[in-house]
């Protein structure tokens, strides 16, 4: 396989080629320290505050797409073939303010100003996609941006007023779209990228077959897709992650499509890209999906990464377990498929051998008479980690429960099915008493721990109450449902 020792990308429309790139180098440090583009700020360095928000454009199926991402945890090596847009790009001739900036000024959306560039870039990304967004769409776009002083009301008013100052059709990104597309296409040479800096190494395989070969050659490599977790290993724990194999550029892993009886999801599909199809097939997931992290993280993080990470409090594994998903693992040319729940062996341990990687996820399409719900319990509504996550998939025919798949996160060392609760439901009448009895069976399935997110008692009580909530939502009996109280 032919390789090259450098990454090539565009920065605010300028061609960049770098060969001195370490596996742990971040986009934020490059912008601020190497390019002196200091409009992009460092706040949290963990993808929570949004002060470092930039846009990254990439060709996908030949089409150029821009997304808001967190520069603080976006690793430089992953930018090969991309167009990075920082807040400095928005400046017009003679310092003229961009429509997003002008709206923020006129509606007093900035006070200390530290968070303002990040808000500007998130609103810019939204405005380019939806020039006349609803308030819900604005709030969704700003989930990953925190302001400590001004408050959000003037920022939301500014977001609604952007079109008073200009149209996306007249924006530089729109006017230069064809040129940028052509230039990014010219960067696609089908070669493996192999970067070395001091003792650090980062590899971008040419395709999934090359990925399989690279992992056979370097089975101890850290695999990185969205870097929403690994990025914190770098910024918070100062961990040496080299050698790194990057996955987010591989189009084969970023495909999601409906097939006859299932949804095919490549392991590199982001939360944002999965949302359209998964939430269309399973409408109950829309509210749940909106609770996963913030907009920037959903644009970066991948479904496969959330599974492979193996966290007991990951958001998507309980949902996928309840839906009966299967995953395909690949090592070299060999593949094996297993139910997703069998992948999670113990805390920090997954059924994955050296040199093997998660390639695809297979989610069955909804069956008749199935009732679905998914719930996330956390201290904050937006951009928080789950205390408890639960997903229900129950089939009812003629008033009798025919099958049940119920899974929880935050209740054990791994995402796990509630086998005793499932067994208690099957064959029973669809009634609150049946759900209450099944909830009591949770004590046979789980012995939750106490940590700073929640106590063991709280976790068990809220999990039992989710059975009652599930029944209420699917029976219209909300006023009569009795909740467990400690």
Regions found by a protein language model. Give the residues of each.
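S4-like RNA-binding module at protein N-termini
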Residues: 56-87
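Flanking scaffold residues of small Cys/His-coordinated metal-binding clusters
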Residues: 4, 39, 44, 64-67, ...
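Short, contiguous acidic and Ser/Thr-rich linear segments
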Residues: 14-23
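NAD(P)H dinucleotide-binding glycine-rich loop of Rossmann-like/cofactor-binding domains
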Residues: 81-107
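A basic, amphipathic helix-loop patch mediating RNA/tRNA/ribosome contacts
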Residues: 22-54
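C-terminal structural segment of proteins
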Residues: 10, 15, 55-59, 68-71, ...
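Short structural boundary motif marking the start of a folded domain
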Residues: 3-9
């Amino acid at each position: 396989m032919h390789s090259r020792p450098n990454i090539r990308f565009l920065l605010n429309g300028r061609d960049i080629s770098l060969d001195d790139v370490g596996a742990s180098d971040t986009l934020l440090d490059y912008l601020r320290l190497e390019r002196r583009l200091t409009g992009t700020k460092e706040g949290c360095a963990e993808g929570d505050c949004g002060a470092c928000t930039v846009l990254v454009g990439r060709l996908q199926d030949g089409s150029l797409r821009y997304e808001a991402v967190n520069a603080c945890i976006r690793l430089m090596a992953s930018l090969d073939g991309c167009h990075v847009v920082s807040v400095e790009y928005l400046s017009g001739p003679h310092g003229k303010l961009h429509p997003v900036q002008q709206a923020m000024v006129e509606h007093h959306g900035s006070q200390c100003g530290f968070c303002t560039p990040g808000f500007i870039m998130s609103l810019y990304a939204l405005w380019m996609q939806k020039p006349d967004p609803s308030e819900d769409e604005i709030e969704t776009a700003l989930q990953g941006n925190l302001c400590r002083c001004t408050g959000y009301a003037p920022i939301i008013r500014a977001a609604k007023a952007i079109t008073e100052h200009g149209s996306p059709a007249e924006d530089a990104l729109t006017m230069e779209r064809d040129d940028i597309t052509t230039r990014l296409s010219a960067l696609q040479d089908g070669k493996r990228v192999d970067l070395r800096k001091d003792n650090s190494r980062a590899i971008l395989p040419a395709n999934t077959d090359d990925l399989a070969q690279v992992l056979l050659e370097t089975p101890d490599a850290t695999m990185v897709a969205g870097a929403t977790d690994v990025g914190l290993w770098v910024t918070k724990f100062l961990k040496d992650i080299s050698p790194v194999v990057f996955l987010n550029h591989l189009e084969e892993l970023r495909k999601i499509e409906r097939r006859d009886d299932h949804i095919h999801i490549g392991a590199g599909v982001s939360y944002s890209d999965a949302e359209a199809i998964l939430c269309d097939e399973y409408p109950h997931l829309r509210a749940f999906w909106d609770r996963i992290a913030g907009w920037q993280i959903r644009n970066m993080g991948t479904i496969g990464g959330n599974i492979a990470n193996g966290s007991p409090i990951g958001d998507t594994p309980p949902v996928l377990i309840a839906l009966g998903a299967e995953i395909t693992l690949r090592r070299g040319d060999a593949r094996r498929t297993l139910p997703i729940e069998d992948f999670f062996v113990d805390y920090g341990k997954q059924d994955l051998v050296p040199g093997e990687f998660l390639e695809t996820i297979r989610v069955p399409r909804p069956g008749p008479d199935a009732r679905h719900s998914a719930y996330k319990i956390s201290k904050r509504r937006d951009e928080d980690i789950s205390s408890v996550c639960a997903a229900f998939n129950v089939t009812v025919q003629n008033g009798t429960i025919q099958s049940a798949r119920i899974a929880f996160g935050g209740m054990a060392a791994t995402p796990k099915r509630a086998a005793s609760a499932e067994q208690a439901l099957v064959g029973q009448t669809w009634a609150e008493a049946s759900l209450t009895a099944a909830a009591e069976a949770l004590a046979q399935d789980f012995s939750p721990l106490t940590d700073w997110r929640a106590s063991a008692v709280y976790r068990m009580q809220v999990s039992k109450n989710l059975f009652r909530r599930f029944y209420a939502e699917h029976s219209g009996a909300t006023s009569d449902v009795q909740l467990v109280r400690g």
